[in-house]
């Protein structure tokens, strides 16, 4: 939760004036990590120049560099890190030529990013949230008590600024490191699948499940404490509403609320994105398995055909007889299977003959509605006709009835623009949508 008091031009001029620059090739970065690791094992946090040279020798051996110029190269590396403000050098008149070195905040920050922050710990996060909850509660109680400006600075603003905000920044940094770890896991999975996906399936599953579990642990821990943290922040905000001179506290509380909302929101969004990637990987694996299964079968079949004379084989297949439904009520549906297919001309002639007979009968029966000027409810009429015919003929009969009915007249309700209700016309789910014909 850093707050810059300088403008961008001022910061640029300041960096240019002090000649700030960082250049860390992989060997120099490895040397810095080695120094930080060895420094962490010492109680005083100090290292002599000889110890730095020993650390550089280990790095040089790991990179298979020549050992003849180890002293010169180590001295150059140490001087370069001092120039880049990664190491501080302290000399004394009593021990001339035997300097003492300490890591600078910049050096600690870089090495901390690569070493200590690489490990996610639910316990560490829980402890951080516990400390934040305690600090916020004390700040909220102090805000509720009220007091002078010194009281607000000492008991409310300072804990929020220098404890709560820094822990929020640490949690935010943990999330950003998890983002990088997700990208690294994706790269590892891609490399595994490109090499030998069959052997890589178990490794991919392990990477996916571990990352999903870590993200879920992080989010569950945040959500469990998020409501309490927000409640205490709201208590502080309510206490500042009656004081016009506490804008600095109110602004800080607003920034903390935004930071907390952003942390929790991104945690859930990160989980959703990872779930989508997880499904994508599993879909790819399933597709690869299906494709490879067919490819293996085709390859084995080709190999069997090529080596038939050396290793003869026999192919056995089965073909079940077709079951024919001979019930009388289903004869119309299975007519082609029982009697065989009719020639096109004969089939067309049979259909036209039936259609003409039905059309003549239906036309004669429907003419009564026109003669008597009786409204014709197409849904009821079609249902009555279909009840007289088997299900296989329902479509043809319904089409004939509708064609003959629309020739008699129109429905005045059609001109209103309102849709007609759907009416069932048989017991098999068929429906018709039509207004009552009342104008012939």
Swiss-Prot record:
Q: Which UniProt keywords apply?
A: Calcium, Cell cycle, Cell division, Chromosome partition, Cytoplasm, DNA condensation
**According to the UniProt entry, where is the signal peptide?**
none
Question: What main location does UniProt list?
Answer: cytoplasm
Location in the cell reads: Cytoplasm, Nucleoid
InterPro entries per record: Chromosome_partition_MukF, MukF_C, MukF_C_sf, MukF_M, MukF_M_sp, MukF_WHTH, WH-like_DNA-bd_sf, WH_DNA-bd_sf
Listed GO CC annotations: cytoplasm; nucleoid
Gene3D superfamilies annotated for this entry? Chromosome partition protein MukF, middle domain (1.20.58.590), MukF, C-terminal domain (1.10.225.40), Winged helix-like DNA-binding domain superfamily/Winged helix DNA-binding domain (1.10.10.10)
GO BP annotations listed? cell division; chromosome condensation; chromosome segregation; DNA replication
Q: Which GO terms describe its molecular function?
A: calcium ion binding
What this chain does, per the entry, is described as: Involved in chromosome condensation, segregation and cell cycle progression. May participate in facilitating chromosome segregation by condensation DNA from both sides of a centrally located replisome during cell division. Not required for mini-F plasmid partitioning. Probably acts via its interaction with MukB and MukE. Overexpression results in anucleate cells. It has a calcium binding activity.
User: What family does the entry list?
Assistant: Belongs to the MukF family.
Name listed for the protein in its UniProt record: Chromosome partition protein MukF
Q: Which organism is it from?
A: Salmonella paratyphi B (strain ATCC BAA-1250 / SPB7)
């Amino acid at each position: 939760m850093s707050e810059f008091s300088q403008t961008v031009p001022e910061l640029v001029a300041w960096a240019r004036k002090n000649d700030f620059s960082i250049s860390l090739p992989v060997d120099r970065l490895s040397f810095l990590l080695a120094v930080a690791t060895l420094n962490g094992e010492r109680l005083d946090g100090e290292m002599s120049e000889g110890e730095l040279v020993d650390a550089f020798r280990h790095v040089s051996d790991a990179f298979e560099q020549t050992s003849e110029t180890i002293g010169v190269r180590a001295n150059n590396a140490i001087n370069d890190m001092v120039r880049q403000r990664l190491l501080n050098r302290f000399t004394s008149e009593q021990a001339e030529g035997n300097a003492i070195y300490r890591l600078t905040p910049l050096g600690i920050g870089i090495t901390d990013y690569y070493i200590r922050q690489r490990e996610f710990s639910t316990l560490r996060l829980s402890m951080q949230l516990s400390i934040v909850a305690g600090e916020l509660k004390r700040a909220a109680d102090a805000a509720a008590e009220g007091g002078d400006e010194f009281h607000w600075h000492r008991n409310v603003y300072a804990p929020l600024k220098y404890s709560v905000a820094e822990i929020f920044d640490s949690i935010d940094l943990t999330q950003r490191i998890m983002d990088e770890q997700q990208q690294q896991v994706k790269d590892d999975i891609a490399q595994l699948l490109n090499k030998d996906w069959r052997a890589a399936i178990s490794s991919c599953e392990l990477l996916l499940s571990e990352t999903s579990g870590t993200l879920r642990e992080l989010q569950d821990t945040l959500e469990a404490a998020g409501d309490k943290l927000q409640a205490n922040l709201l208590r502080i905000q309510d206490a500042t509403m009656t004081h016009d001179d506490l804008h600095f506290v109110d602004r800080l509380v607003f920034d903390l609320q935004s930071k907390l909302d952003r942390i929790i929101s991104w945690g859930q969004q990160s989980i959703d994105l990872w779930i989508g990637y997880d499904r994508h990987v599993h879909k790819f694996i399933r597709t690869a398995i299906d494709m490879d299964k067919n490819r293996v079968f085709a390859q084995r079949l080709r190999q069997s055909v090529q080596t038939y004379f050396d290793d003869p084989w026999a192919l056995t297949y089965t073909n079940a007889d077709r079951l024919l439904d001979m019930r009388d009520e289903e004869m119309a549906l299975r007519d082609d299977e029982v009697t065989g297919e009719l020639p096109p001309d004969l089939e067309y002639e049979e259909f036209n003959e039936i259609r003409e007979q039905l059309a003549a009968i239906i036309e004669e029966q429907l003419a009564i509605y026109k003669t008597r000027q009786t409204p014709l409810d197409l849904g009821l009429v079609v249902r009555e006709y279909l009840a007289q015919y088997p299900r296989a003929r329902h479509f043809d009969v319904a089409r004939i009835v509708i064609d003959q009915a629309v020739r008699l007249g129109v429905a005045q309700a059609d001109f209103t623009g309102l849709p007609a209700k759907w009416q069932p016309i048989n017991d098999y789910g068929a429906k018709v949508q039509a207004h009552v014909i009342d104008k012939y």
